[in-house]
């Protein structure tokens, strides 16, 4: 079992995932050096279960992925998410690499989705609606054309373009990407909008501070058609700031904020003039573990189980509905924010596997071993559970299952990074945004 971590040792343990500053991203997460055979076997099983979600919830005709599904596989959910479908596309590429499906099957599954999205699904200047009917592609009521969800779909499409270069997938994926009017989505200023609705126009919110939007901005800056100016990358605030063990980091409490962009873009070996985004995600993860342990001391009856063994807060289901919970918060007072009630969300450490390996894999293995099939089943981990009350979500959510799949694979091989970063959009984005390769050359 992975040893418990605390204090400065926790910081160095996060760096272990990099292993050697002189190797590639793929080598930086290779299982032969970074993880034990037992941990690799655990991740292999977790990955395969996670991918099963994207196999079984894909509509047979459209390939669109259900936004959520019963953890026991008994559901028939009609709503697809475009972000969910983007994770599914990346999952198809991983499945081929791992030998779960053939290359022909991976190409066929990806082509089905991409052709349907290109030819059948309504869009506004290239931007799709966040939630659509899984079988028809029609917009779900009141669903916006969400920019971040579009980015998560497109980055999945571009990953398949590099995974299957000898097929027609690259041409289809690039058609979808190139018709997106990124400049229009600025609405005349330096910040991309959250989205657009036909009933009201642009949503009354912009991407102006540190959040999960880095993948969105970089795709917009790196676009071949209708890109936004590189100055837009510099315009947003790298804050607000918190401090953990003497290091400042830009924060937002739910951990998915620090994981989605990092699953695709290589922030380990490339840095800009503003911030070390990889280190920032490590600090955010470790600060959350520390905060949850202090919550356990302050609220032992409700949260006494929070520990190195049981931690993880990110947006998820809760007993009373969907919650955007996380930790820590800007206010220095130690208290449970946003209704935090002792719930543990496995996708929080799941999405941090490649960022902070040891504490993340430790809690996931503990959760599987301690609670068994109550929390670990057909699609991997249930979306959330509360060890104190015994509540367990009946559902798995596609985006949470997806980030766990991607980061488990990045931990083992670096495959998602190395595949996506070959795409010209990724290369252009880093060049235009001023990222420099800090990787030392091989000797």
Language model features: what each stretch is:
Residues 2-8:
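Gram-negative bacterial Sec-dependent N-terminal signal peptides
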Residues 10-13:
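C-terminal motif of bacterial Sec signal peptides marking the signal peptidase cleavage site
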Residues 1-2, 404:
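N-terminal export leaders
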Residues 15-17:
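Bacterial signal peptide processing site
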Residues 23-443:
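Ser/Thr/Asn(+Pro)-rich, low-complexity disordered segments
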């Amino acid at each position: 079992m992975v040893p418990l971590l605390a204090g400065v040792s926790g910081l160095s343990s996060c760096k272990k995932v990099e292993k050697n500053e002189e190797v590639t991203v793929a080598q930086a997460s290779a299982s032969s050096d970074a993880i034990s055979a037992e941990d690799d076997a655990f991740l292999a099983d977790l990955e395969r279960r996670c991918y099963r979600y994207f196999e079984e919830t894909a509509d047979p005709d459209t390939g669109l992925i259900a936004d959520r599904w019963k953890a026991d596989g008994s559901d028939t959910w009609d709503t697809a998410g475009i972000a969910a479908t983007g994770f599914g596309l990346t999952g198809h590429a991983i499945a081929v690499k791992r030998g779960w499906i053939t290359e022909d099957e991976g190409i066929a599954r990806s082509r089905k989705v991409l052709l349907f999205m290109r030819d059948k699904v309504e869009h506004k200047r290239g931007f799709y609606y966040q939630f659509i009917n899984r079988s028809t592609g029609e917009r779900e009521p009141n669903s916006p054309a969400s920019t971040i969800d579009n980015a998560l779909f497109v980055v999945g499409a571009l990953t398949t373009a590099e995974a299957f270069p000898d097929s027609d997938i690259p041409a289809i994926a690039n058609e979808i990407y190139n018709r997106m009017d990124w400049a229009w989505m600025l609405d005349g200023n330096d910040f991309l909008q959250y989205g657009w609705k036909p009933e009201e126009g642009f949503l009354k919110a912009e991407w102006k501070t540190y959040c999960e939007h880095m993948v969105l901005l970089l795709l917009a800056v790196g676009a071949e058609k209708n890109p936004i100016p590189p100055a837009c990358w510099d315009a947003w605030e790298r804050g607000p700031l918190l401090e953990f063990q003497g290091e400042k980091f830009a924060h937002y409490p739910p951990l998915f904020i620090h994981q989605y962009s990092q699953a695709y873009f290589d922030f380990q070996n490339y840095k800009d003039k503003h911030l070390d985004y990889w280190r920032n995600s490590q600090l955010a993860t470790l600060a959350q573990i520390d905060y949850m342990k202090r919550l356990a001391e302050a609220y032992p009856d409700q949260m006494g189980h929070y520990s190195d063994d049981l931690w993880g807060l990110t947006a998820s289901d809760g007993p009373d509905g969907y919650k955007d919970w996380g930790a820590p918060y800007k206010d220095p007072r130690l208290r449970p924010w946003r209704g935090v009630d002792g719930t543990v969300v496995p996708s929080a450490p799941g999405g941090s596997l490649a960022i902070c390996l040891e504490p993340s894999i430790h809690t996931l293995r503990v959760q599987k071993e301690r609670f068994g099939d109550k929390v670990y089943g057909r699609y991997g981990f249930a979306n959330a559970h509360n060890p104190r009350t015994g509540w367990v979500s009946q559902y798995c959510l596609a985006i949470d299952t997806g980030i766990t799949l991607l980061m488990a694979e990045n931990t083992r091989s670096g495959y998602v990074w190395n595949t996506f970063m070959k795409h010209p959009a990724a290369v252009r984005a880093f060049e235009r945004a001023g990222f420099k390769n800090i990787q030392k050359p091989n000797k």
